[in-house]
């Protein structure tokens, strides 16, 4: 520090020291119930909250950027989700009931609020409660003339019918979201390019009418008549984003901050296979205060949230459409990841952080591009972020209890603060659009080509929901023009039911690979779609991500000899064989159409015992009192073994991280002995932690008293190079 201050010169040093002395000093007190998972000599003290103005003085952004307050308490408290209507007004989900106040009949104290800046000074000056009586709403998005809200166990559709900004209609669109853990439920609602509603869910899962899934990405039609699980992640999912090309990404809250979603799980046999892959180069983050508290993955994205892209011109050119923003609330920061093509898929480089604070309450949980083209940040502003595992004497430093939401009960959780900021680049242009609320058809048509993805999707939504079929001719003309508007014109025609075969064929033959890719994704899954795909040549597209989309389409077409022969022929292509995404999609297509086996694509079984010399570690997911032992004479024939015993209910394990080859078939095998295993849990078993939902990779489970019993499970490592 002294060297830096010397190097910057006397004037800047004086400026720095003046700024530091002007800040309100952080103040602390000693309190109980501060988890100490890091096993510091003593738990951290409780920092008192700061005003928004003082908090900003402890928060860093890059040179050339400004963090500007839009709203704060009492205007908004505990903001968990952000969305904007066609008028450019911010809507926020506010939840003081999170995480444990699950109310009877789900009538709670939470709200959907509209926050407006009516005088153009950049600050909220009008707050309207659109809907109240909610209980832990986690996300919202617009469609069908109203707003969709995740309100587990339901997804609601709310609509104002008389123009007073109050919800007059409240309908249930979906039922079945799990409520066993409130931070693992549904979130991240988005209006998709395909005119359906997309979202994510964690391990609380969805289950209704035989449709069960969890920890990943799904979509549903606006009326809720169809719900599809599309991309399997490996744990609690709380991030979703679309780049300008329509490719899908996400993040999970367990050290996996950037996933690419390459293949829909609907085409994979038994929904098992490579549908999504963690592509981040590193999950490490870099707080600017040592006083961070985490439950696991110390120093990394253990609570990653969001994956919005810099999809506007309000960012440096090298960022646009490529850089994603991922929140890390346990590190008091907002991180960045640079995505780039990697074969048919993507890779994602950890690009450090964009915002970081030494205020220990600063807790960004959502970051989205707003109608002004800038990055808006939802600051939960809370000293306690951790949900679970529940602290116990050995892990966390004291014995806590879980509440109804499966979060540890903690009197230090705050229900009085919340902030929403805008991050503004000094060189950002002013938005060309302020509102599409009263826009004409011509204005909506022009907005399909706006530089801000928000306005493009909003215009598309309004045209489709408004059934504006009278502009189909203009939309077809736009598909034939260069620029990003062609993609949205294509999907608008599709949503209106006006995408004719000639327009579709021309899009498939376009010189723009992104338009070709989206045209493939819009193909009808019938004989007409088969004709279009074979007329276009996209199954051999030089753009490998577009080729991947074509292979996915092949796997969804009805079986026919032309399709079967094409899949067999494509399997002999060396490029297709070597690319993990292309080979996985072809493998799914081959199984669907019973095409000839691709010898070069068959998985090679490993004969080596990868568990012979590993570092076994203890994990306690819930419950207290378990002992983890390494007896030397209680194993088979008096040998060594690993042992867990507990007098109380617990979810715990011995685990080891193992390096594996991607797309390789393995067998997990061992022997288990049990005594007195009872209760409502699964029992004693082996499993692969990253492959546990919707159908867990797990062995037979033993309960009661059983002598040494061999159990095993065969599985595929998919795109993973390390498993637990």
Each language-model region and where it sits:
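Structural detector for internal amphipathic alpha-helices that build alpha-solenoid repeat scaffolds
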Residues: 431-434, 454-467, 484-498, 503-509, ...
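Extracellular and organelle-lumenal recognition/adhesion modules and their flexible linkers in secreted
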Residues: 596-724
